[in-house]
Regions:
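Active-site phosphate-binding strand-loop segment of PLP-dependent enzymes
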Residues: 141, 146-218
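Short acidic capping loops at alpha-helix termini that bridge into adjacent secondary structure
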Residues: 89-95, 115-118, 165, 227-230
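Helix C-cap/helix->beta junction micro-motif
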Residues: 26, 136, 196-197, 226
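Conserved active-site segment immediately N-terminal to the catalytic lysine
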Residues: 197, 214-233
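Conserved PLP-anchoring active-site segment centered on the Schiff-base-forming lysine
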Residues: 111-133
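N-terminal small-domain helix-loop-helix segment of the aminotransferase-like
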Residues: 2-100, 107
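A short helix-loop-beta submotif of the ANL/AMP-binding
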Residues: 135-141
Length: 233
């Protein structure tokens, strides 16, 4: 029997997916279950999206391979989104699309992380960061945030964990799983700290649109220098 590689053998299954599968099994048994596992919306896909997908199929727009970085119209729409939401002036050449944020993050770590590079991850965090970084032969470094500070990352905490091997900081805001948000001043402090310490920021903003009472803030919108030092998911 073929042997699984040592690299993959070190990787643990996704805890959230395991919880989700268990919840499905219990529901199938007739149990009343409230699942707090995967971040899955409780509403259907908006009809305008469904109709656009059907229309693209009928027009045979999906019959062929797309450009490696994604469909031009989609990349241009992403530029427009960030201009409208954050005032960020993006060019199409600065945008790449992926089959989901998980694959985008995996591609980022495989592209930027060399063996032994350290990647800072504030706790609590989305479980797959760890496995993806380890697949890239990087070293996840977990920052112990504090409940009394709403689990927020601070410059003081960053100073405790940074070393000469630190390559990246993963910042997830709005946060999965805590839901925390940062103020503009807090993000600016983190962004400037990253510049000072030559640490590149991977800003995971996939919950950007799921904030309803206050505006979301993108790390890349704070200054041109921080923009140049940030990759937004």
């Amino acid at each position: 029997m073929v042997k699984i590689s040592d690299r993959v053998s070190k990787i643990l299954p996704s805890g959230t997916l395991a919880m989700t599968q268990k919840a499905r099994e219990l529901k199938a048994q007739g149990r009343k279950i409230i699942s707090l596992s995967i971040g899955e919306p409780d509403f259907n896909t908006p009809e305008v999206i469904t109709e656009a997908a059907i229309d693209a199929l009928r027009k045979h727009e999906t019959d062929h391979y797309t450009p490696a970085l994604g469909i031009d119209k989609l990349r241009q729409a992403i530029c427009y989104f960030h201009k409208r939401k954050d005032g960020i002036d993006l060019q199409k050449e600065q945008v790449a699309t992926f089959a989901g944020a998980k694959f985008a993050l995996y591609s980022v770590f495989m592209t930027l992380v060399d063996p032994g590079d350290e990647v800072l991850i504030p706790i609590p965090y989305w479980v797959s960061y760890t496995e993806q970084i380890q697949l890239a032969d990087g070293v996840p470094v977990y920052i112990e945030t504090r409940e009394r500070n709403s689990f927020k990352l601070t410059v003081d905490l960053l100073n405790e964990y940074v070393t000469d091997k630190t390559k990246l900081l993963v910042l997830n805001a709005p946060s999965n799983p805590s839901g925390l948000l940062y103020t503009k001043e807090e993000l600016l402090a983190i962004g400037n700290w990253a510049l000072e310490h030559n640490v590149f920021v991977v800003s995971d903003e996939i919950y950007y649109e799921l904030v309803y009472d206050v505006p979301s803030i993108s790390m890349a919108s704070l200054s041109q220098e921080i923009f140049n030092n940030t990759l937004v998911i």
